[in-house]
UniProtKB/Swiss-Prot annotation:
<dbReference type="InterPro" id="IPR023195">
    <property type="entry name" value="Nict_dMeBzImd_PRibTrfase_N"/>
</dbReference>
<keyword id="KW-0808">Transferase</keyword>
<keyword id="KW-0169">Cobalamin biosynthesis</keyword>
<dbReference type="InterPro" id="IPR003200">
    <property type="entry name" value="Nict_dMeBzImd_PRibTrfase"/>
</dbReference>
<comment type="function">
    <text>Catalyzes the synthesis of alpha-ribazole-5'-phosphate from nicotinate mononucleotide (NAMN) and 5,6-dimethylbenzimidazole (DMB).</text>
</comment>
<comment type="pathway">
    <text>Nucleoside biosynthesis; alpha-ribazole biosynthesis; alpha-ribazole from 5,6-dimethylbenzimidazole: step 1/2.</text>
</comment>
<dbReference type="InterPro" id="IPR036087">
    <property type="entry name" value="Nict_dMeBzImd_PRibTrfase_sf"/>
</dbReference>
<keyword id="KW-0328">Glycosyltransferase</keyword>
<comment type="similarity">
    <text>Belongs to the CobT family.</text>
</comment>
<feature type="active site" description="Proton acceptor">
    <location>
        <position position="313"/>
    </location>
</feature>
<dbReference type="GO" id="GO:0009236">
    <property type="term" value="P:cobalamin biosynthetic process"/>
</dbReference>
<dbReference type="GO" id="GO:0008939">
    <property type="term" value="F:nicotinate-nucleotide-dimethylbenzimidazole phosphoribosyltransferase activity"/>
</dbReference>
<protein>
    <recommendedName>
        <fullName>Nicotinate-nucleotide--dimethylbenzimidazole phosphoribosyltransferase</fullName>
        <ecNumber>2.4.2.21</ecNumber>
    </recommendedName>
</protein>
<dbReference type="InterPro" id="IPR017846">
    <property type="entry name" value="Nict_dMeBzImd_PRibTrfase_bact"/>
</dbReference>
<dbReference type="Pfam" id="PF02277">
    <property type="entry name" value="DBI_PRT"/>
</dbReference>
Amino acid sequence: MEFAPVSPPDGHAAAAARARQDTLTKPRGALGRLEDLSIWVASCQGQCPPRQFQRARIVVFAGDHGVARSGVSAYPPQLTAQMVANIDRGGAAINALASIADATIRIADLAVDADPLSQQIGIHKVRRGSGDIAIQDALTEDETARAIIAGQRIADEEVDRGADLLIAGDIGIGNTTAAAVLVAALTNAEPVAVVGFGTGIDDASWARKTAAVRDALCRIRLVLPDPVGLLRCCGGADLAAMAGFCAQAAVRRTPLLLDGMVVTAAALVAERLAPGSWQWWQAGHQSTEPGHALALAALDLDPILDLRMRLGEGTGATAALLVLRAAVAALTSMTTFAEAGVAGTSTSPPS
């Protein structure tokens, strides 16, 4: 799989945003991380001050995983299709958060083990479910390529329709197990260091999940460091599509907010598919899954929020969008000392 080269965000716009921050009516650095985020947005948009986001778009990638049949989740596999329907009806957590964050939602069924809910939702569907990664490949070579291309196309479709910020989310029973394998493989971590309690599993289920990750890691070492091979062996169509989506967003110079463990695991692979992509991403939050912190550290991303969330769907990233909007608003709407006629136009006043 080949992606076009990723060019970095605009350094001149970043410098202009940093300089403007230092002239606003506040002590220098007083807005903390909000200042850093506003500079990042300006660099992604190539202008200072940056524009407020007009078309933030959430894409929830859905897929089932064969490993779920091994008792690694607190919920049955058929819940994935039911949750897709719930999001489509507007009744899920992501719907509530998207509404207040002024973002819209698209569901992409890549591998739900059921017929697509609609033609639009299933237009990029690759297959139903995936192989049990503890004992067999998740996908064939052809399915892996199709899933990555699907993610690329979804990113292109959204950017071509005017999306100025993308959020990647996930839904799928068993997907944190596949994500844990990818994170462990790409950070050289032991299974016990990356496996969390996911949907709220008990100790026995955690032990089964850890064993499944261990067995999958034995298989995945045969394909390291090939990113496409990793997705084929121990990913799934949803994770492969997420990787293609995250990489293509960077190729298209469109800022993207990562969500939790599953999306960040896919992003680790995306960075290997299209080096430099990470510059176009922010980590919306840090989840309670232990492997998530390892994945974020590997990408050198500092999470915007830490609210002990572990839901997925894009909820953590969508909550962070409100913070990102605040950062843009402050840089754009605040007056400078000179504009306000306030003393201290050369240097910021003491705090």
